[in-house]
Amino acid sequence: MKKTIVALAVAAVAATSANAATVYNQDGTKVDVNGSVRLLLKKEKDKRGDLMDNGSRVSFKASHDLGEGLSALAYAELRFSKDVKNKDGEVIKQPIGNNVHAKRLYAGFAYEGVGTLTFGNQLTIGDDVGVSDYTYFLGGINNLLSSGEKAINFKSAEFNGLTFGGAYVFSDDFDKNGLRDGRGFVVAGLYNRKIGDVGFAFEAGYSQKYVKQEVASVLPPPPGSVTVYKDEKEKAFMVGAELSYAGLALGVDYAQSKVTNVDGKKRALEVGLNYDINDKAKVYTDFIWAKEGPKGATTRDRSIILGAGYKLHKQVETFVEGGWGREKDANGVTTKDNVVGVGLRVHF
């Protein structure tokens, strides 16, 4: 589950970990390094069991105090593995440590009591929306513009539990006459309050982006013809609310999206329940209902996820998680799927 954490200049370097090691702190300049190795042993229906990298990373965070509450910041995050895909875009291999690459790379400014403004390859505020996903790797229905390789992102400081912001993402194609695939914006608001042992959260976001759509042809295309694409807008919104008491939390999210000139919408509802048994152990469950397509030709999905997590140490986390899904297409044909995984995360 993603929590809204906003705290002056330090929070501006997103994903700050309490376990970060400060390697330099002098004359207003601070540099932190942290990371984690995340491994997952997974078995999916009709596939072989496999051991894979589940997002291992190393991050570097730097901030420079400019005075008067203003600071400059920079963030770089390295990942170590990339899926191998075939020509149709299907994943055929998931190696471990086959590709060291920069997953995030951005810089910007933070102003105390106002917020942060960053530029580069980063998550947007849209990624913060969602309260019902308590899982480690199977849950989540976020449909917003949540990241961009060329993004400008603003996130406010917290004002009595309220945080808000927006982001603009540039298209990868700088050709003026080219497709604008990926270009768009997102705005979001996050509200979190806690009174005693009772907590409440409400989050909402809206985004628009251009997506590439194939131009339909009345006649079958001749052999050797080139597929033609055009830009269409995808409009999406997501809302969620969470109620918590002591170690028990219940979250509900709803997401919907629609592409211009494409029949039908995508809708999804996720309900999550999490119970922290103590500081080390938790159990959780998630239910997801989704449907896609025009009336009379709708595909429906149902999923249930169960899991438990246990911390062997404040920096060593283990978990087991299983999911069972059922999809029913427009013709009434039902397909079932299941997956189970055991994971280990060692933070440093």
Swiss-Prot record:
GO molecular function, one term: porin activity
Domain of life from the UniProt record: Bacteria
GO annotation, cellular component aspect: cell outer membrane; pore complex
Signal peptide from the UniProt entry: 1-20
Function: Structural rigidity of the outer membrane of elementary bodies and porin forming, permitting diffusion of solutes through the intracellular reticulate body membrane.
GO biological process per UniProt: monoatomic ion transport
Gene3D superfamilies (alphabetical): Porin
Membrane-related topology note: Multi-pass membrane protein
Keyword Transport: yes
Major subcellular location class: membrane
UniProt-annotated location(s): Cell outer membrane
Keywords, sorted A to Z: Cell outer membrane, Disulfide bond, Ion transport, Membrane, Porin, Signal, Transmembrane, Transmembrane beta strand, Transport
Subunit structure: Disulfide bond interactions within and between MOMP molecules and other components form high molecular-weight oligomers.
CDD domains documented for this protein: gram_neg_porins
The protein's name in its UniProt record: Major outer membrane protein
Family annotation (InterPro entries): Gram-neg_bact_OMP, Gram_neg_porin_domain, Porin_dom_sf, Porin_Neis
